């Protein structure tokens, strides 16, 4: 295992993962393996070394399999760790393997971890869930996976959501796909729908839900996904009481504003200081914003609505709170371009703010 120290190098990383997996025999990574709770015999003497390994940054072998996009090693690890707390171990930045997969936009990896039982409500150091991070990096397919009810049992890689359908509309029927042709009623558990629902209302340490994040980043497609999944379109953020409509106006995102209004967002909602979305729109140079709001019944602002509040000003394109809700991420070494959604982001030297255009 000394080769793990060289994981920063592509060749050494592949060699370590491949040799470690290959030395365990042809059936080591078979689905439904003995699991971490099995009694360790001579054939499992390697397990404490692999599952107990942690880098100086707090990354486990599972973190490394995700970072290096090593699918065979990932499948092997999940074969033994599905349904265990190992999936939710956090590195020094509070990131689980699921957080990293979302940051990298690796939808197939997100799905494997999700189906294996990874926690979707675990928050990293900035308070972000995996869905928050998917919204920040515009990983739409990752969000599609996370916005589906979790299957009752882990599925084979050939039977995943991504291979079944390319339609990203969340399934709100709340009926998980059948994974056993002959289920045993005595052993059948209730579908675990609650986690994916709770993601929609989860707040990061700035009080932003995934919908707030998507609106601030002017991502109409992500807003549509969250709307279809049942996100609260009128939930205010805690600092000034801005609803998604207020945030869309401040971001001057007309397409997002129109989407929210057509979906039923309340144009009469007020910030804590009394300002309506239309009152905020009249302070912006884009006339389309006010026109859209008036077309959907927004009331004309009162005199006090014209006063500037501590939360906004009329001089910037986006005056959302530009304080970051997370800390900087580790330098992520990626040596494969297999991302299904997007190219992996370059390492951040500073925290990534929710507001893409800070004042």
Curated annotation (Swiss-Prot):
Residues 344-359 have a biased composition (Pro residues). Residues 160-172 have a biased composition (Polar residues). The keyword Nucleotide-binding does not apply. Residues 318-331 have a biased composition (Acidic residues). Phosphorylated by RPS6KA1; followed by degradation. Interaction with NKIRAS1 and NKIRAS2 probably prevents phosphorylation. It is found in: Cytoplasm; Nucleus. ANK repeats lie at residues 57-86, 93-122, 126-155, 206-235, 240-269, 273-302. Residues 153-194, 298-359 are annotated as: Disordered. The gene is Nfkbib. Keywords: ANK repeat, Cytoplasm, Nucleus, Phosphoprotein, Repeat. Pfam families: Ank, Ank_2. It comes from the Eukaryota. The modification Phosphoserine is found at residues 19, 23, 313, 318. InterPro entries: Ankyrin_rpt (IPR002110), Ankyrin_rpt-contain_sf (IPR036770). Belongs to the NF-kappa-B inhibitor family. Highly expressed in testis followed by spleen. Its main location: cytoplasm. Interacts with THRB (via ligand-binding domain). Interacts with RELA and REL. Interacts with COMMD1. Interacts with inhibitor kappa B-interacting Ras-like NKIRAS1 and NKIRAS2. It comes from Mus musculus (Mouse). The keyword Magnesium does not apply. Inhibits NF-kappa-B by complexing with and trapping it in the cytoplasm. However, the unphosphorylated form resynthesized after cell stimulation is able to bind NF-kappa-B allowing its transport to the nucleus and protecting it to further NFKBIA-dependent inactivation. Association with inhibitor kappa B-interacting NKIRAS1 and NKIRAS2 prevent its phosphorylation rendering it more resistant to degradation, explaining its slower degradation. This is NF-kappa-B inhibitor beta. One of its GO terms (biological process) is cellular response to lipopolysaccharide. One of its GO terms (cellular component) is cytoplasm. The lineage of its organism: Eukaryota, Metazoa, Chordata, Craniata, Vertebrata.
């Amino acid at each position: 295992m000394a080769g793990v120290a060289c994981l920063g190098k592509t060749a050494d990383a592949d060699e370590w993962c491949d040799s470690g997996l290959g030395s365990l025999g042809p059936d080591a990574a078979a689905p439904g393996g003995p699991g971490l709770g099995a009694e360790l015999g001579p054939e499992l003497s390697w397990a404490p070394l692999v599952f107990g390994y942690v880098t100086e940054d707090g990354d486990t072998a599972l973190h490394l399999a995700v970072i290096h996009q090593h699918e065979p090693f990932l499948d092997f690890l999940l074969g033994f760790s599905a349904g265990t707390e190992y999936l939710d171990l956090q590195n020094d930045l509070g990131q689980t393997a699921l957080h990293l997969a979302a940051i990298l936009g690796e939808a197939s990896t997100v799905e494997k971890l999700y189906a294996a039982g990874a926690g979707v409500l675990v928050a990293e150091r900035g308070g972000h869930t995996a869905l928050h991070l998917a919204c920040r990096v515009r990983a739409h397919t990752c969000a599609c996976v996370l916005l589906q009810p979790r299957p009752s049992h882990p599925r084979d890689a050939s039977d995943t959501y991504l291979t079944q359908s390319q339609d990203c509309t969340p399934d709100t029927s709340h009926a998980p796909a059948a994974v056993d042709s002959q289920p045993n009623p005595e052993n059948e558990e209730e579908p675990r729908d609650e986690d994916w629902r709770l993601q929609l209302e989860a707040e990061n340490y700035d009080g932003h839900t995934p919908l707030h994040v998507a609106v601030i980043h002017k991502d109409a497609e992500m807003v549509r996904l969250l709307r279809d999944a049942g996100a609260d379109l009128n939930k205010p953020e805690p600092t000034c009481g801005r609803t998604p409509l207020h945030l869309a106006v401040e971001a001057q995102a007309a397409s997002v504003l129109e989407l929210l209004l057509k979906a039923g967002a309340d144009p009469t909602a007020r910030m804590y200081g009394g300002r309506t979305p239309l009152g905020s729109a009249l302070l912006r140079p884009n006339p389309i914003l006010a026109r859209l709001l008036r077309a959907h019944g927004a009331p004309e602002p009162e005199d006090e609505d014209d006063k500037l509040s501590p939360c906004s000003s009329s001089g910037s394109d986006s005056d959302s709170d530009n304080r970051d809700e997370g800390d900087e991420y580790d330098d992520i070494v990626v040596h494969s371009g297999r991302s299904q959604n997007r190219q992996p982001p370059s390492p951040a030297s500073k925290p990534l703010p929710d507001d893409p255009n800070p004042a």
